[in-house]
Amino acid sequence: MKFLSLFIYRPVATSLLTLALVLSGLLGFRMLPVASLPQMDFPVIVVSASLPGASPETMASSVATPLERALGRIAGVSEMTSSSSLGSTEVVLMFDFDRDINGAARDVQGAINAAQSLLPSGMPRRPSYRKVNPSDAPIMIMTLSSDTFSPGQLYDYASTQLAQRLSQIDGVGDVTIGGSSLPAVRVDLNPQALFNQGVSLDAVRTTIANANVRRPQGAIDDRQQRWWLKTNDELHTAAEYRPLVIRYHQGAAVRLQDVATVTDSVENVRNAGMSNARPAVLVVIRKSPQANVIDTIDRIRDEVPQLRKTIPAAIQLEIAQDSSATIRASLHEVEQSLAVSVGLVVLVVFAFLRSGRATLIPAVAVPVSLIGTFAAMYLCGFSLNNLSLMALTVASGFVVDDAIVVLENISRHVEAGLKPLQAALLGGREVGFTVVSMSVSLIAVFIPLLMQGGIIGRFFREFAITLSVSIAISLVISLTLTPVMCARLLRSSAPRQQPRRRGFGRMLLVVQQGYGRALHRVLDHARWALLVFVASLGLTVYLFISMPKTFMPEQDTGRLMGFIQADQSTSFQAMRSKVEHFMRVVHADPAVESVVGFTGGWETNSGAMFIALKPLSTRGDNAQQVIARLRSKLAKEAGATLWLRAVQDIRIGARQSDGGYQYSLLSDSLDDLRQWQPKIRRAFASLPELVDVNSDQQDKGAEMALTYDRTRMARLGIDVADVNGLLNNAFGQRQISTIYQPLNQYQVVMGVDARYAQDINALNQMYVTNHQGQPIPLSSFASWQPANAPLSVEHEGLSAVSTLSFNLPEGVSLSQAAAAIDRSVIALGMPSSVRGSFSGTAAVFEQTQSSQLWLILAAIATVYIVLGMLYESYVHPLTILSTLPSAGMGALLALKLFNTPFSLIALIGILLLIGIVKKNAIMMVDFALQAQRQDGMPVREAIFQASLLRFRPIIMTTLAAMLGALPLVLSSGDGAELRQPLGITIVGGLVVSQLLTLFTTPVVYLYMDKLRRKPRWRPVPAQS
């Protein structure tokens, strides 16, 4: 450590280098993006296809299956699911984490092209795809409402003007419009009028399509100029379509208005959006990857006044919900914890050193290390989020350790009579290796985590690198700036001290002397101390195995998602009234700020709600308590069920479900799946460890099954294609023509008027035109009867799948729920044709369960290797690592005491403890080895003196680390659920470890020294 003198003798250069580090950190801080959690870019692509009027089973067999066969051949697909409903199919592809999303998108487009020839010819457009991130919840929801404009007009303004402007804002990734559909001209046919006039549905469709064409007409050139030809070949409004002549009947023109009601309406009338129970069109905004959430929301808010100017004054554009408030509050809480941690750490130093000048040294080292870390975070592309700020909060107790060790040793020499400059040179060299060992071994803890693949590695990479960088900067500061400041600020001890300081020093001396006496007795009965060590190891293993576990702590983000489901035969109008009723009840809750909901689309028996809660400081109750209260209010509502779950900042898996966790049932036999799914669902619903159990299997929809008499059809001159075309024209909401406008394109939609299709008698009014042009009643060759039919068909891979979703009641961990599910499935005795497995977050939790122990063992092994290299010894690292069992025991006992399940956040706390508690042993072992080698001191006396000599810095560093994490334990504001497990783990582990390792480490050192000195067997040469 001779290089220390280079900095000690050049204080100006050292201070300027430190200033440069601080300035670069401040600059990086200003440019860092802000987010709730590290960016998790799940490579997911959704392929969408539509065939209006097609049944879910038809969509599954003719659209989903060809696409799945082509898409399933793409390399790197980890999960492929599809959902087919009335007229639409979505195939969701989740790729491996290391798969480039842009390359995957090119492969997806190629697969779609390859499957195109196998898809039905009547599809209005080619299948399309989009990149999505399932973990990205909406950052803002805007609403448009009006007393004078229709929902279709509001939707048109939103899609043609607002969506374009919003998409251009920096940071906006996706803008989705919901709550209605685009304007359209609707042709609602009167079957009886068609029959009376001798007009077929196909004739109406052909007439409309031929009357609205958009083709170039060319130009005429005369000698002087060119004349472009323009015709009135396009029709734009219902009024222009009504007088169209379809045919002449008995010498009179049969116009469209004679056989149909033609109105300016919307493409899909079964679509509704609401804001606080008032009709509204919804604008849902998501951010782009790597975007700063706060800055993006601020830019959107700044643009809102300009957006309002682009729409009529009678339209109210409001921001219904945005996520910035809870993110700001959560980050503010972490920043407060960070400030309190730094203050407590400095207070600990002052209490022990009893000198303002000495306290100033670590008081400078801590913020310099933390601020300098911001520069590295910016260069690494990180963000200011809960995890990175938690890393800095915890680091405030770590980075001071190096400065404390150096400062305490230099102060000891100053108190012994050396001049500050000499003390800085000598003291810095003495502990230089110790400081390097402490810091390098602490950073080594995170090497396995950084090498970890999958979600754990991606999620905690920012935390690990941020903490490692702050420790590395602290190491540099402690070996450069700290000795310089010690040489300039410390003063030789005054002969007289103030009574207050003398009293504290005397108290510390008494404690140290008491520790010395106790250590003597422990060393005299070393076997008992070793037994305590072994017992703590056994108890740690037992606690880890029996501890309730979960994936991530349940967060209170101030946002809830509600899913409403009614009977599968529920009509759109009935469902709309139910959704409005649920929204009124939810909005009346004192904790709810606003409610935005929608229903409709192709599934008329379901709806959804986005619920924004009031600030936590205002509502008092956490999200789970609000959910429990609303659940009890709405439990007895007839005809529909509402499922609620708290929105989480991280969501794994692209599969949509009503609950936060999923269990999937797969089978190659759809009949077996439909037979066993209700049994398993009932079994899950009876488990006290689960709530809100639901299934996405909807196979009880009302269907009218038509049976054709093909012999009679042949005799009448009718083809099956003609009949299916008739049914599609009548009931398929068929888009038969396109209206082109400057800003958008709109559709002409044809179908039987709802007044004539309210019951099954509508089929009796259907007539098919045969090959001779004669109208033939549908009932003359077809019969029909009601039956059950699926509202949607789900696939995973190429197998039928049904997903059971569930939530957890308060106080139940995911491991307890998973164990209950496994027991229930075993008890049911499912056949081999039905396979069950967890999906989404629950599946990742199962995978991480097996990797957690290996991650801890890998961290211990890495630290052992690093320490072995530093000490050039196989034995001494074992002495240092002997501190770990007591720390693990304390951490797990603390989690049990606070009724907190073991999560990934607690796992990070365990890894941190591996790095923290060994510092105490390092300080003891270093000085004991030095005393043995340089002074020839006996091993027992060496470790005894080392323990006494390093007692003060050990207590100081442990208290600093403990108090640095204490604000995390005591936090109660926004985001506290994420911070508390980390603080509880660290504080609990440090308390127990401090009480035990001060005694067990010297004992282990003695036994290891005996092991090292044990005579080895050597071959005896043969005597001649």
Curated annotation (Swiss-Prot):
Transport keyword on record: yes
Membrane topology: Multi-pass membrane protein
Record keywords: Cell inner membrane, Cell membrane, Membrane, Transmembrane, Transmembrane helix, Transport
Any Pfam family the entry gives: ACR_tran
Gene3D superfamilies hit by this protein: Multidrug efflux transporter AcrB pore domain (3.30.70.1440), Multidrug efflux transporter AcrB pore domain like (3.30.70.1320), Multidrug efflux transporter AcrB TolC docking domain, DN and DC subdomains (3.30.2090.10), Multidrug efflux transporter AcrB transmembrane domain (1.20.1640.10)
Cellular compartments annotated: Cell inner membrane
Coiled-coil intervals: none
Transmembrane segment boundaries: 3-23, 333-353, 360-380, 387-407, 431-451, 463-483, 528-548, 853-873, 875-895, 897-917, 953-973, 984-1004
GO molecular function annotation: xenobiotic transmembrane transporter activity
Cellular component, GO annotation: plasma membrane
NCBIfam families per UniProt: PRK10614.1, RND_permease_2
Oligomer and partners: Part of a tripartite efflux system composed of MdtA, MdtB and MdtC. MdtC forms a heteromultimer with MdtB.
Family under the similarity heading: Belongs to the resistance-nodulation-cell division (RND) (TC 2.A.6) family. MdtC subfamily.
Protein name: Multidrug resistance protein MdtC
Lineage of source species: Bacteria, Pseudomonadati, Pseudomonadota, Gammaproteobacteria, Enterobacterales
